[in-house]
């Protein structure tokens, strides 16, 4: 288990660097006169998929957001299942602290966002934007402090971020679903029933789950629910153990996907969605309720919610601090959780999918600026509270 955590942290640290480079490249290409048109044209390339009478025709940007991100969510589903069954969330005592912290870290940012946007029917739809944490960026910053970071603090951040991702998935399913097409939903329910039956029989063929998962993805896409949720559902049904003692299908797939997700899918998502055209940006609009609500949620709501809910959970005796971790380190890492980026941008695209492109631009700017500031402040806070290297646990 410790080996898996270390591998995960190394991957996410490198992925954080890749994300940063992809973001900078996207902004540069979108704003350089020589490449700006080509960048937009590249994302608008039509890609068509046909299977008999079934036809799915989308541009490259939507394929990245709907199809490739489903693989990202498949990995999240596998990680959440592993942690729930045999990892840091497997027992009540282990799970309570990161669970409470994650809930506080979602509720407070949403409330702060609504304080700024409660009276605007359009921007109010973005209430969940600051509720997410980008695990790759957060872990990337944490690893800059090397061996000074206690193992318990790393596990706490990983568990918190995984629960946070699960919360974001539930929010997407419950609040960002368009009008439902019932025949396609019936097909999705049937596909889920097949997955459940395969899991009950402990079918060990990963390819069988992925094949049914492909059908589920198409059904969910057609029924109006966001198609990326298919990835999470498939991840939950792939078994961790098989009756014949073969290697775990879920663990094998998780290891196989981690590198592709970390170094291709998530950076490609950032490259496709972070290319904000800065020409015409009005400074005053950076201080609009939308941008301020996002910034307040990420920079204030995240640390306040995580810190308060963690303190209450420990105070009431429902949880204990991890071994070698002090509460001021929990406070410092809560600032780091204000890095929203990938999931925040993803929710932005859902919240304003039928609205003004200008709203999306200023929401993305708010996310990028607040996430960058959270990374800097979180690093400085951790640097101040972590023990010197010769005293590190």
Curated annotation (Swiss-Prot):
HAMAP family, alphabetized: NhaA
Q: Which residues form a coiled coil?
A: none
Listed under catalytic activity are:
Na(+)(in) + 2 H(+)(out) = Na(+)(out) + 2 H(+)(in)
Q: Does the keyword Nucleotide-binding apply?
A: no
Q: What is this protein called?
A: Na(+)/H(+) antiporter NhaA
Q: Which InterPro entries match?
A: Na/H_antiporter_dom_sf, NhaA
Under the GO molecular function aspect, what terms does this record hold?
sodium:proton antiporter activity
Name the gene that codes for it. nhaA
Q: Which organism is it from?
A: Pectobacterium atrosepticum (strain SCRI 1043 / ATCC BAA-672)
> PANTHER family, alphabetically?
NA(+)_H(+) ANTIPORTER NHAA, SODIUM ION/PROTON ANTIPORTER NHAA-RELATED
> What function is annotated for this protein?
Na(+)/H(+) antiporter that extrudes sodium in exchange for external protons.
Question: Any idea where this protein resides?
Answer: Cell inner membrane
Topology relative to the lipid bilayer, per the entry, is: Multi-pass membrane protein
Write the signal peptide boundaries: none
GO BP, sorted A to Z: regulation of pH
Keyword annotations? Antiport, Cell inner membrane, Cell membrane, Ion transport, Membrane, Sodium, Sodium transport, Transmembrane, Transmembrane helix, Transport
Q: Which residues cross the membrane?
A: 14-34, 60-80, 96-116, 125-145, 155-175, 179-199, 218-238, 263-283, 292-312, 330-350, 362-382
Reading the lineage from the top rank, the first entry is: Bacteria
Name the family the entry cites: Belongs to the NhaA Na(+)/H(+) (TC 2.A.33) antiporter family.
Organism classification, top ranks?
Answer: Bacteria, Pseudomonadati, Pseudomonadota, Gammaproteobacteria, Enterobacterales
């Amino acid at each position: 288990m410790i080996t898996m955590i270390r591998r995960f942290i190394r991957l996410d640290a490198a992925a954080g660097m890749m994300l940063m480079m992809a973001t900078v490249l996207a902004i540069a290409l979108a704003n350089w006169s020589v490449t700006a048109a080509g960048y937009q044209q590249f994302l608008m390339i039509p890609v068509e998929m046909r299977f008999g009478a079934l036809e799915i025709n989308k541009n490259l940007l939507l394929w990245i957001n709907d199809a490739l991100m489903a693989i990202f969510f498949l990995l999240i589903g596998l990680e959440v299942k592993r942690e729930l069954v045999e990892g840091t969330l497997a027992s009540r005592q282990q799970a309570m602290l990161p669970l409470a912290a994650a809930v506080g870290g979602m509720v407070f940012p949403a409330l702060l966002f609504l304080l700024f946007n409660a009276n605007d029917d359009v921007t109010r739809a973005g209430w969940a934007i600051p509720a997410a944490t980008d695990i790759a960026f957060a872990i990337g910053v944490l690893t800059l402090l090397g061996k000074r970071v206690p193992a318990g603090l790393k596990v706490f951040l990983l568990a918190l971020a995984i629960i946070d991702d699960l919360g974001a998935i539930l929010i997407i399913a419950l609040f960002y679903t368009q009008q439902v097409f019932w025949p396609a939903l019936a097909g999705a329910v049937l596909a889920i029933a097949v997955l459940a039956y395969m899991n009950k029989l402990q079918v060990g063929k990963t390819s069988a789950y992925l094949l049914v998962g492909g059908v589920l993805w198409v059904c969910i896409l057609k029924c109006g629910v966001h198609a990326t949720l298919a990835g999470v559902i498939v991840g939950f049904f792939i078994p961790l153990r098989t009756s014949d003692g073969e290697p775990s299908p879920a663990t094998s797939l998780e290891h196989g996907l981690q590198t592709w997700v970390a170094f291709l899918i998530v950076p490609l998502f950032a490259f496709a969605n972070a290319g904000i055209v800065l020409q015409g940006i009005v400074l005053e609009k950076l201080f609009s309720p939308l941008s301020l609500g996002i910034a307040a949620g990420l920079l204030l709501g995240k640390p306040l919610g995580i810190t308060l809910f963690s303190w209450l959970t420990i105070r009431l005796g429902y949880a204990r601090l991890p071994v070698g971790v002090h509460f001021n380190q929990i406070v410092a890492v809560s600032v780091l959780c204000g890095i929203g980026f990938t999931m925040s941008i993803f929710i932005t695209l859902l919240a304003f999918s039928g609205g003004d492109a200008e709203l999306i631009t200023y929401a993305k700017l708010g996310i990028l600026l607040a996430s960058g500031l959270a990374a800097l402040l979180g690093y400085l806070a951790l640097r101040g509270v972590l023990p010197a290297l010769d005293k590190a646990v």
